[in-house]
Amino acid sequence: MKIIAKTDIGLVRATNEDTYTFIKKDEKNFMAFVCDGMGGHLGGSYASSKTCDMLNEAFEALDPTKPLKNIGVWLFETLQNINMFIYQESLEKENLRGMGTTVSGVVCLNGELYYAHIGDSRIYIYNEYELQQITVDHTYVNSLLLNGLITYKQSLKHPKKHVLTNALGIKKNVSVDIGQIKLKETENVLICSDGLHNMLDGKKLQKALNEPLVLEEKIEFIKDKALKNGGVDNITLILLEQK
């Protein structure tokens, strides 16, 4: 598995509140996460970067020779602990009040691959023929869409399109979507913030992912496509491609 990441401030925002992290110990033990902070420059940047730092610490502390009984439980407990830390910081420090962050990413331990998701960053599985979103956006507009109250076309222009219904650090407990991923040999993983998926719809994104480029050129190409389509938000993406 080859892992590469890229972040860009975009063309509109004054600061970049996105943060990414990845650690690869070996082919069977790795992690990768994207966090999109919110709550003003200082709060949003702090929430996303601190979350990534704490994920790094938790993953580095794992011993591959002592397999976890349940990776999903470890992910849930780790994110709950980080959530409580960010939440307490926001209560105690006035300049960080109201901060929070999305969290979307994957953890592979001894060849078992799991994902965790909070917010509206996304995880996709892709190959030459298909792009599949495996996460559900935790947004007000997506809840309307899932309940049949608006159409997909209406959701694209809805004034509350960016309102989150779930984020890390905004309350004592956080809901986390967790699941196992069983990749086929031809399948790869994309993790990205909404600054990418709002600029490139499914067809454009799939086309960009299948450009005949080496991984370093491909990630630059995708980022540039998002900038050319508006670049109205910070853009962050991680590609995990099987060799």
What are these regions (language model features)?
Residues 1-243:
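PP2C/PPM-type serine/threonine phosphatase catalytic domain
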